């Protein structure tokens, strides 16, 4: 803490030296001072408020008075707007009697102490530096006069009104000719000192001026006519201050800086957001604690109704979309169930096919050991049925025992044929099949698998009608031919009709 105090003191000394060497233009100083007076002293017109602030400042000063000697040790608030911290430094100054307080010709920095009471080293120039200061007016140290009896006044009173310079902290209720820390001088005191130094004849160097930063705007609150009730002996309901809302835009007004002193350690308030000057109203305020809302215009009502209609239509669209998605999901689930059923049926079909393959392989094994007798094979050449055409695709299948089936179908068994060698029959002669085992000769005049021979019989006419129906002829022609078929009599006429139908269907 001592290093910070020494740093601020050295910076203040450098600033004052620069001002003494390069004084600013008097016209610019007067212009800045007039602007500062207009913005920072609106509360001086109210005498009651000024007196109340003086009494409060005096109460604070008297609460810090020592019990010994005429020296006064107090806290000088140091405001650092950049980091939001408040530093205090112990000040030792001579305090003359209250009735003999007069503004001195200047302010002299004599000694600087830290919080532990030790003197700060390394600032020897502060003892010899004298800064001229004129009459400051109703600024700085003149604002602290009052009586000790006023300190019992209610502490809940609002001290944020009046002079804007009070927002920078409390000032002492005396008019000393010494100051403990040069860097603690307020902007108003610097302006007054520079104006006084200009009046005493300090020359100005061309092209070098001093620019003062603007004091942040402080919006004055509207005091209620009926103050809030103070503490009573019984519990009661408080209805608030009844403050009328000054802005309906929804922006939070910047709070006035507290003027009360604090003996507790300072706390950093970094990353504090700046107050919003204007913001869009987001919700309707409730008529509570005396807050009044402005009447709604017709345009606002129409915009709200349009907004409600658009919101309702959007909700309906979202609902319909959700319904459509639900239906699609239901259809997909139904198809999935169908696929599961088809999968089960496919598995059963595969099992049946495997069973049929096993049965077919079994039949093929049996067929390999069976001999199929072909009609006409082994017949005598003199037999009239021996000239029947044989299907060339049919071949005799011989089993494992090639001699056994032949001996069973021949006219004479093999045993009898082998014993009769003297009869002139050799073993290599062609055997004859038994007549009972021979097929009857095929009648070429009757219908068979070889060909169709129409006759005036019901089965023959039924076969012919089936041929007509299965043909690709128009329906009208089919009806005509079926009608003619019913009226035809005789084998010859039926044969001619058959030839005609064959020519029409194969055309």
UniProtKB/Swiss-Prot annotation:
Chain spans, region Interaction with the nucleocapsid (N-RNA): 459-507
Gene3D superfamilies in the record: 1.20.5.110, DNA helicase RuvA subunit, C-terminal domain
Coiled-coil regions listed in the entry: 310-339
TM helices/strands, residue ranges: none
Region spans: Multimerization: 304-376
Function noted in UniProt: Essential cofactor of the RNA polymerase L that plays a central role in the transcription and replication by forming the polymerase complex with RNA polymerase L and recruiting L to the genomic N-RNA template for RNA synthesis. Also plays a central role in the encapsidation of nascent RNA chains by forming the encapsidation complex with the nucleocapsid protein N (N-P complex). Acts as a chaperone for newly synthesized free N protein, so-called N0, allowing encapsidation of nascent RNA chains during replication.
Biological processes, Gene Ontology terms: DNA-templated transcription; viral genome replication
Protein name stated in the entry: Phosphoprotein
Chain segments carrying region Disordered: 31-86, 123-172, 242-307
Record GO terms (molecular function): RNA binding; RNA-directed RNA polymerase activity
Stretches with biased composition (Acidic residues): 147-160
Reported modifications of this chain: Phosphorylation on serines by host CK2 is necessary for the formation of viral factories.
Domain of life of the native organism: Viruses
Entries under Pfam families matching the protein: Paramyx_P_V_C (PF03210), Paramyxo_P_V_N (PF13825)
Subunit structure: Homotetramer. Interacts (via multimerization domain) with polymerase L; this interaction forms the polymerase L-P complex. Interacts (via N-terminus) with N0 (via Ncore); this interaction allows P to chaperon N0 to avoid N polymerization before encapsidation. Interacts (via C-terminus) with N-RNA template; this interaction positions the polymerase on the template for both transcription and replication.
Similarity section: Belongs to the morbillivirus P protein family.
Keywords: Coiled coil, Phosphoprotein, Viral RNA replication
């Amino acid at each position: 803490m001592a290093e910070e105090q020494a740093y601020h003191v050295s910076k203040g000394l450098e600033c004052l030296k620069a001002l003494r060497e390069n004084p600013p233009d008097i016209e610019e100083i007067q212009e800045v001072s007039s602007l500062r007076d207009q913005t920072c002293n609106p509360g001086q017109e109210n005498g009651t408020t000024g007196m109340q602030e003086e009494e409060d400042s005096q109460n604070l000063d008297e609460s810090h008075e020592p019990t010994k000697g005429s020296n006064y040790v107090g806290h000088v608030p140091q405001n650092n707007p950049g980091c939001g911290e408040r530093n205090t430094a112990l000040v030792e100054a001579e305090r003359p009697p209250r009735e003999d307080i007069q503004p001195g010709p200047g302010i002299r920095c004599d000694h600087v102490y830290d919080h532990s009471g030790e003197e700060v080293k390394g600032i020897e120039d502060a003892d010899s530096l004298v800064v001229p200061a004129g009459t400051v007016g109703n600024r700085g140290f003149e604002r602290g006069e009052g009586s000790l009896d006023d300190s019992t006044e209610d502490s809940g009173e609002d001290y944020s009104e009046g002079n804007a310079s009070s927002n920078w902290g409390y000032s002492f209720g005396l008019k000393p000719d010494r100051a403990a820390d040069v860097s603690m001088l307020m902007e108003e005191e610097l302006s007054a000192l520079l104006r006084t130094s200009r009046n005493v004849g300090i020359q100005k160097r061309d092209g070098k001026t001093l620019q003062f930063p603007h004091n942040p705007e402080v919006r004055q609150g509207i005091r209620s006519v009926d103050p809030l009730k103070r503490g009573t002996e019984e519990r009661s309901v408080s209805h608030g201050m009844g403050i009328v809302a000054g802005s309906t835009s929804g922006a939070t007004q910047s709070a006035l800086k507290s003027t009360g002193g604090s003996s507790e350690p300072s706390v950093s308030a970094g990353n504090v957001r700046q107050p919003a000057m204007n913001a869009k109203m987001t919700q309707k305020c409730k008529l509570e604690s005396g807050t009044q809302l402005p009447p709604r215009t017709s345009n606002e009502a129409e915009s709200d109704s349009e907004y409600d209609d658009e919101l309702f239509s959007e909700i309906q669209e979202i609902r319909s979309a959700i319904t459509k998605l639900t239906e699609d999901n239901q259809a997909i689930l139904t198809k999935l169930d169908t696929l599961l059923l088809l999968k089960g049926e496919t598995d059963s079909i595969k099992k049946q096919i495997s069973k049929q393959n096993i049965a077919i392989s079994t039949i093929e094994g049996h067929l390999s050991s069976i001999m199929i007798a072909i009609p006409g094979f082994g017949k005598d050449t003199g037999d009239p049925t021996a000239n029947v055409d044989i299907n060339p695709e049919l071949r005799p299948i011989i089993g494992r025992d090639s001699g056994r089936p032949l001996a069973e179908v021949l006219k004479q068994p093999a045993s009898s044929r082998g014993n009769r060698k003297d009869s002139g029959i050799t073993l290599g002669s062609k055997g004859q099949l038994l007549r009972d085992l021979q097929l009857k000769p095929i009648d070429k005049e009757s219908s068979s698998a070889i060909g169709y021979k129409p006759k005036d019989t019901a089965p023959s006419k039924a076969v012919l009608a089936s041929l007509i129906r299965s043909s690709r002829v128009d329906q009208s022609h089919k009806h005509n031919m079926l009608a003619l078929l019913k009226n035809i009599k005789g084998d010859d006429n039926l044969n001619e009709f058959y030839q005609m139908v064959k020519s029409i269907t194969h055309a």
